[in-house]
């Protein structure tokens, strides 16, 4: 009798602990499954998830409800984590925001995401996800923002998207999605998004949708009437019938239609069967066995607590381990870095609130790296802007980083040339911690997008020559006319933005990498003993990589002429491929982009000559390049031997028909 009583008591206590710990046994377990699916975490952002006794609400990227009983937000963006999306994420049913933007997530989007009925923001953009968009996303009845841009998603849009009547932002650009966005209904005004065998009326979706981007996929058909209020750039780079859009080439569209979409081997059947087996297994257990398991589990838990107490005791008595590159908050307060207050007196300072309004709550992301995010926005006066936001935490910000940030702002503010992006201002705030740069926005996208994602034929030979000379003039200005000189951190076609009339603008969006690298290099100069660290007048200035810029310009010239990227998995490096054409003048025409109908042989020879001179330099050693042509000489060669008459006419008009008329 007594044993039965104790068993019942143990059962009641066990059930009490289980019910009190419902948060831990459900949502925390799902978070741990997500952590297990991440196999690389180079920045150690999830390192504090490993402590079994820590509060999940204190884990990096986890935000809980005010009562701390549910997870309502997961934000681990731009953290370089590699892995899969665990299906168990669908068990965190109180989740309102799932933001995993800018990582290296692979595999498919699990259908279990559709279980998150409270989700308002789903941001999986800029990853390596594949396969179709699961139809279960249509079950996210309260969703307001979906961002799946810049992945490898395939298939057609699921018809169930028509159920999302509160969706106001949809970003699915830069994937490999196919199918039609619209089939006109009987009235001519109803729009339908088609899945494989069904369609759904998205009239409600059209009413709610304020921002959308379908560009650079393989969609066909026409733009839905209810989406005609969106910018035309939201549909460019597809295979649609609208003549006023920049389309993919006919060969790309034809190939896309021939390729059958085979999703990655889905693990759903196996996963589903495993769930059914587990469910059956649980249902078949007798009650006495369940009670025994609870008692055993409690005893194991007690032993774990004793072991944990012992480990904590030993940890508190451990010898101190000093990590040289980490400083505690108390150590950070021991020194101060004095910065010249006059340094930024002539540069406009904008508030975070101003930029938040201009960039629509920082939702319009146009670029991302491990160090920064780039947003597009519009100021009150109507000026379009590109805002670079540094991805760094306040506790990681040092006096040296602050100095380098201000020097970078002052350096960029010096630039004033037709072929360099203009810095409009900066943002610096403490709460929330913010460091941003604000540039004028070139509305025609990057050179890389035009050459490799858009309709390359629209960038005719005349326009390409105009871009070549514009880049050369920009580099000449930066290297030769500025005092002190200025170099682009990573010169590539992604760093060349184009205006409506195809004027190139050199932009240094990768300057953060230089700032962080130089800060770490100088960190050893900070004395932990002294109370003040005064920066010497001779402190190193902006790192000048003139030879690297000129070498990169040579690669750019080949990329512009050929339409090929610097590296392609199937065809290798552009430089290696181009060698045979550069060394044999009679075969030089083989370099030219096949998308071009016309080109000028003399211009081609000039560009190839300059490219060869650039590539013959040593990009790692400025001292070995004294006898090589300077950027001024290279620019003069291009300007004197390439006719600018066509480019001059094109400059007065940004319409494509003007160029076509000149070509004919």
Curated annotation (Swiss-Prot):
Residue ranges that the UniProt entry lists as topological domain Cytoplasmic: 310-664
Catalytic reactions of this protein: L-seryl-[protein] + ATP = O-phospho-L-seryl-[protein] + ADP + H(+); L-threonyl-[protein] + ATP = O-phospho-L-threonyl-[protein] + ADP + H(+)
Glycosylated residues in this chain: 75, 197
Membrane topology field: Single-pass type I membrane protein
Topological domains annotated Extracellular: 23-288
Subcellular location, principal: membrane
EC number(s) given by UniProt: 2.7.11.1
Transmembrane region(s): 289-309
Similarity comment text for this entry: Belongs to the protein kinase superfamily. Ser/Thr protein kinase family.
Name by which UniProt lists this protein: Probable LRR receptor-like serine/threonine-protein kinase At1g63430
Species this chain originates from: Arabidopsis thaliana (Mouse-ear cress)
């Amino acid at each position: 009798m007594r044993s039965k009583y104790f068993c019942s008591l143990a059962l009641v206590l066990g059930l009490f602990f289980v019910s009190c710990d419902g948060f831990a046994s459900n949502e925390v377990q799902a978070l741990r499954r997500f952590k297990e699916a991440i196999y690389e975490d180079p920045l150690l952002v999830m390192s504090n998830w490993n402590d079994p006794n820590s509060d999940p609400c204190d884990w990096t990227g986890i935000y809980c409800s005010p009562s701390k009983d549910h997870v309502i937000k997961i934000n681990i963006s731009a953290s370089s984590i590699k892995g899969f999306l665990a299906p168990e994420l669908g068990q965190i049913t109180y989740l309102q925001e799932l933001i995993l933007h800018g990582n290296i997530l692979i595999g498919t989007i699990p259908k279990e995401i559709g279980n998150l009925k409270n989700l308002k923001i789903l941001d999986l953009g800029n990853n390596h996800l594949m396969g179709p968009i699961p139809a279960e996303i249509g079950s996210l009845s309260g969703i307001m923002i979906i961002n799946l841009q810049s992945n490898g998603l395939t298939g057609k849009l699921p018809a169930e998207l028509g159920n999302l009547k509160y969706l106001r932002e949809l970003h699915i650009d830069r994937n490999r999605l196919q199918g039609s966005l619209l089939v006109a209904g009987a009235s001519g005004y109803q729009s339908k998004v088609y899945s494989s065998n069904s369609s759904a009326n998205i009239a409600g979706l059209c009413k709610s949708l304020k921002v959308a981007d379908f560009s650079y996929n393989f969609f066909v058909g026409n733009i839905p009437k209810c989406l005609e209020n969106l910018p035309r750039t939201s549909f460019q780079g597809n295979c649609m019938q609208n003549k006023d859009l920049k389309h993919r080439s006919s060969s790309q569209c034809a190939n896309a239609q021939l390729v059958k979409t085979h999703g990655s081997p889905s693990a759903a059947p196996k996963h589903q069967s495993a769930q059914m087996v587990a469910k059956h297994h649980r249902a078949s257990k007798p009650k006495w066995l369940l009670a025994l398991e609870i008692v055993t589990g409690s005893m194991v838990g007690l032993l774990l607590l004793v072991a944990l107490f012992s480990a904590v005791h030993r940890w508190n008595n451990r010898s101190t381990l000093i990590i040289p590159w980490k400083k505690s908050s108390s150590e950070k307060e021991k020194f101060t870095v004095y910065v010249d207050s006059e340094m930024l007196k002539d540069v406009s300072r904008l508030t975070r609130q101003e930029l938040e309004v201009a960039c629509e709550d920082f939702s319009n992301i146009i670029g991302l790296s491990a160090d920064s995010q780039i947003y597009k926005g519009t100021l009150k006066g109507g000026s379009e802007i590109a805002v670079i936001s540094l991805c760094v935490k306040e506790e990681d910000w040092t006096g040296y980083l602050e100095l380098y940030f201000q020097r970078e702002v002052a350096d960029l503010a010096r630039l004033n040339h037709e072929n360099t992006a203009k810095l409009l201002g900066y943002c610096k705030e403490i709460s929330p911690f913010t460091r941003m740069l604000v540039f004028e926005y070139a509305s025609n996208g990057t050179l890389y997008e035009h050459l490799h994602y858009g309709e390359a034929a629209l960038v005719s030979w005349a326009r390409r020559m105009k871009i070549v000379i514009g880049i050369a003039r920009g580099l000449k200005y930066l290297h030769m006319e500025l005092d002190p000189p200025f170099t682009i951190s990573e010169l590539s076609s992604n760093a060349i933005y184009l205006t409506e009339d195809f004027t190139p603008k050199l932009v240094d969006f990768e300057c953060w990498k230089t700032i962080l690298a130089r800060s770490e290099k100088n960190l050893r100069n900070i004395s932990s003993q002294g109370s003040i660290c005064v920066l010497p007048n001779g402190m190193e200035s902006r790192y000048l990589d003139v030879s690297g810029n000129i070498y990169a310009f040579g690669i750019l010239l080949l990329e512009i002429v050929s339409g090929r990227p610097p590296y392609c998995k199937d065809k290798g490096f552009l430089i290696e491929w181009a060698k045979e054409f550069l060394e044999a003048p009679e075969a030089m025409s083989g370099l030219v982009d096949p998308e071009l109908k016309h080109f000028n042989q003399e211009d081609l020879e000039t560009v190839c000559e300059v490219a060869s001179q650039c590539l013959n330099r040593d990009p790692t050693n400025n001292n070995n390049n004294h006898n090589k042509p300077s950027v001024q000489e290279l620019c003069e060669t291009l300007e004197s031997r390439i006719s600018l008459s066509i480019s001059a006419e094109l400059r007065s008009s940004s319409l494509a028909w003007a160029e076509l008329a000149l070509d004919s």
